[in-house]
């Protein structure tokens, strides 16, 4: 565990910017304008080091009493989303501290975690990339069927993990080693090179890259 930085944000969509060589660079814009530290965990009091972040406004009347007390203790207004990030560098943070987009420098490598788009119930071709049968004489509506999933004698069952039709998407996914193209402190927007998981308006967590280049 190292001195990792993190911000919660909302995916605004994609755009493109010019780089220094005159090429278009595809970027994803992430709003990180309302991040605040709601708690700091230390080894002395909690047994581990971490920082809890809050993001997004919420009606105070819709917050439970325990959470309302938690926010009041930190001296901040209630936040809709909370996340805890492990880091050794907890001394740089304190409850109530606001974090801006300049927490990440331009050119920094980050990992972005979000919830992928839900696709609903999907067949094996769309979900797993199976090959379809030939559309020719004798196939008889087998073009998109999965084929055999378990022989009758051996193994005489369907093994766990068998790739079959089912609900596709709406799972947590992380895209690693993306580059911060720009950090707009005034508007609280990060421009991240490439695509990140999730739809427009989805909540994402931007963290310092765990692997690096």
From Swiss-Prot:
InterPro entries hit by this protein: Ribosomal_uL3, Ribosomal_uL3_bac/org-type, Ribosomal_uL3_CS, Transl_B-barrel_sf
UniProtKB keywords: Ribonucleoprotein, Ribosomal protein, RNA-binding, rRNA-binding
Assembly with partners or alone: Part of the 50S ribosomal subunit. Forms a cluster with proteins L14 and L19.
GO MF entry, a single one: structural constituent of ribosome
GO biological process: translation
Xref: HAMAP family: Ribosomal_uL3_B
Assigned protein family: Belongs to the universal ribosomal protein uL3 family.
Any one Pfam family match given in the protein's UniProt record, by short name: Ribosomal_L3
Biological role stated in the UniProt entry: One of the primary rRNA binding proteins, it binds directly near the 3'-end of the 23S rRNA, where it nucleates assembly of the 50S subunit.
Protein name, per record: Large ribosomal subunit protein uL3
GO-annotated cellular components: cytosolic large ribosomal subunit
Gene name linked to the record: rplC
